[in-house]
Amino acid sequence: MKVYFYHTQNIQYCLRRMAEGEFPSHFLYGACHLADNGIDVVYHRSPKHELSRLKTALYTAWRVLTCREHYDALYATHYKGLELVVLLRALGLFRKPIIVWHHQPIVKSKSRLRELLGRFFYKGFDRLIFFSQKLVDDSLKAPKADPRKLVVGHWGADLAFYDKIKAELKAEQISPSHHLTISPSQHLNTSPSFIATGKEQRDQPTLIEAFNRTGRHLILYIGINPNPNVPNPNLEAVERCEPADNIDVVKICGLLPYEIAREVAKADCVVICCHRTRYTAGLTTVVEALALGLPVICSRNPQIPVDFDRLGCGISVEYGDVEGWQRAVEYIATHPDEARLMGERGRALAEQMFNDERCAKEVAEWIKQFSL
């Protein structure tokens, strides 16, 4: 059996960096391990330059419909860019089943016309994979998609990639509290160190205020756009908060999973402070922390499929709760043995449930259902 694999990111760039050992396979949502489960993959040829949404949809449809290699199903990380193909499937003009990851809950539209169009659009999907049961439960409240098409997938990290990074750092004999991007002499207290990465829906004011009060060492990575005409809301939010000297703000540009993972691996705790959302904001950082065996302090997002407190791999804090963040940071800082155990439990959870090989196995099982 063979699938056509579509991704909103540049697949060829990802594969090239993977071959160089600088890109984790989980960003391809199990596609790299489908062959281990009896499914070959035709990789979508991503456009060389960024296109508008309409042009992307046209380009993708052209690539999918004119593919010379035989394939039995279409597997995608997102429906963005696939809209025309999905509509053709809904009309019965595209004969291959479509299996797609759905990143947000399906919601009912206020407009009757948009709701009717949405219900028709969702007929074009044969399987919708969600990151958590909460996303499925919320989606069932909107009568757009057939409940039988909704499933929960365990998206998780490329464990071998993070094990390789940890081995590299051990070989280089770099102390966990020594970060390449800062001068440790700037801080009287460089251990334990906390690290914040990611960009989606981050609540920088709450995080910075908590660390301003605690005086604990935070390395805060902020993704920026090099184009001066493009706003950088995350950076602007950080600058307005006036971080104290114990907070190192590091500006980064581009997709740098290997470089960032090396820095995360040197930290003692990963912090993920987000605004309230309807989706799994911060999940990429969560699975990375679990893979590296680090404790996590995270905003209490019910969409994320990890209950940190119950599973003992971290601490959850309510949205916008500065004092709650202070308490969590101080607990990790003053209970190093428990923090270490949290990290070990998180790694065990990654090995058992949240890893790329399990993700691929589940996806392969859903794809094979359409070969009968």
Write out the residue ranges for each language-model feature.
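Donor nucleotide-sugar binding/catalytic pocket of nucleotide-sugar-dependent glycosyltransferases
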Residues: 126-140, 145-164, 168, 174, ...
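Acidic anion/phosphate-binding donor-loop and adjacent secondary structure
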Residues: 140-141, 157-174, 178, 186-191, ...
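A short, well-ordered alpha-helix in the C-terminal region of glycosyltransferases
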Residues: 327, 331, 338-353, 362-365
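Conserved acidic donor-binding segment of nucleotide-sugar-dependent glycosyltransferases
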Residues: 310-322, 331-337
